[in-house]
């Protein structure tokens, strides 16, 4: 029998997280820790960074989605993440469009391939 798949975690504003929760990604692990964080105006950078690091260390999470404007707040933590799993993807929010120039993970991925590799 196949094992359980990996979860998607999300760190974002209320609209983003609610959308993903309505899509069915919300889970609690065996320790009753959720796989999401709603970032509000009173959420501290330390809370965001701690949650991000907790998601990195959970073996049940395969992908972490984070609003790009929130990723900017903890860029040093994202840049320090070198493993391929969990994959970290920066996504837009309703108020903040995606800017590929700010996505350090995308820049790193682009450096892994040459133009020949993509033909």
From Swiss-Prot:
Keywords: Cytoplasmic vesicle, Hydrogen ion transport, Ion transport, Membrane, Synapse, Transport. The keyword Ion transport applies. Expressed in brain (at protein level). One of its GO terms (biological process) is proton transmembrane transport. InterPro entries: ATPase_V1-cplx_f_g_su, ATPase_V1-cplx_fsu_euk, ATPase_V1_fsu_sf. V-ATPase is a heteromultimeric enzyme made up of two complexes: the ATP-hydrolytic V1 complex and the proton translocation V0 complex. The V1 complex consists of three catalytic AB heterodimers that form a heterohexamer, three peripheral stalks each consisting of EG heterodimers, one central rotor including subunits D and F, and the regulatory subunits C and H. The proton translocation complex V0 consists of the proton transport subunit a, a ring of proteolipid subunits c9c'', rotary subunit d, subunits e and f, and the accessory subunits ATP6AP1/Ac45 and ATP6AP2/PRR. Subunit of the V1 complex of vacuolar(H+)-ATPase (V-ATPase), a multisubunit enzyme composed of a peripheral complex (V1) that hydrolyzes ATP and a membrane integral complex (V0) that translocates protons. V-ATPase is responsible for acidifying and maintaining the pH of intracellular compartments and in some cell types, is targeted to the plasma membrane, where it is responsible for acidifying the extracellular environment. This is V-type proton ATPase subunit F. The lineage of its organism: Eukaryota, Metazoa, Chordata, Craniata, Vertebrata. The gene is ATP6V1F.
